[in-house]
UniProtKB/Swiss-Prot annotation:
Role this protein plays: One of the primary rRNA binding proteins, it binds directly to 16S rRNA central domain where it helps coordinate assembly of the platform of the 30S subunit.
Alphabetically ordered keywords of this record: Ribonucleoprotein, Ribosomal protein, RNA-binding, rRNA-binding
Segments traversing the membrane: none
Stated name of the protein: Small ribosomal subunit protein uS8
PANTHER family recorded: 40S RIBOSOMAL PROTEIN S15A (PTHR11758)
Domain of life: Bacteria
GO molecular function, one term: structural constituent of ribosome
Gene: rpsH
Subunit structure: Part of the 30S ribosomal subunit. Contacts proteins S5 and S12.
Length: 132
């Protein structure tokens, strides 16, 4: 069976693993998922990312991050642009998430970047998701 929305599947897997405090999770690899995983790592939402090559499409292994008292670092994930309703923003309309406490993932012609980076580079694009 083909997957309609692989990005929503990735976000749901991260959300579910985070809720039950799993240390790591695996998901099928794709270029956009790799870019999203790298952003989550650089923004401090996850500990580490590994790419495992197999004979098929490969696997991304995410290592989730928790605070000192085992509190969650990722408190929320929300898919914004969906296959049935795409959401785009111009460079000057890229939204802030929780007044800058969270990030918006923006798919641009320069790849997937955060909302802060999109404002800095003055580029717009498709608003993939919010993470806070």
């Amino acid at each position: 069976m083909t997957m309609t929305d692989p990005i929503a599947d990735m976000l749901t897997r991260v959300r579910n693993a985070n809720m039950v405090r799993h240390e790591k999770l695996e998901l099928p690899a794709s270029n956009i998922k790799k870019q999203i995983a790298e952003i989550l790592k650089s923004e401090g939402f996850i500990k580490n990312v590994e790419y495992v090559e197999d004979d098929k499409q490969g696997v991304i292994r995410l290592f989730l991050k928790y605070g000192q008292n085992n509190e969650r670092v990722i408190t929320g994930l929300k898919r914004i642009s969906k296959p049935g309703l795409r959401v785009y923003a111009k460079a000057n309309e890229v939204p802030k998430v929780l007044n800058g406490l969270g990030i918006a993932l923006v798919s641009t012609s320069e790849g997937v970047i955060t909302d802060k980076e999109a404002r800095k580079r003055n580029v717009g694009g498709e608003i993939i998701a919010y993470v806070w």
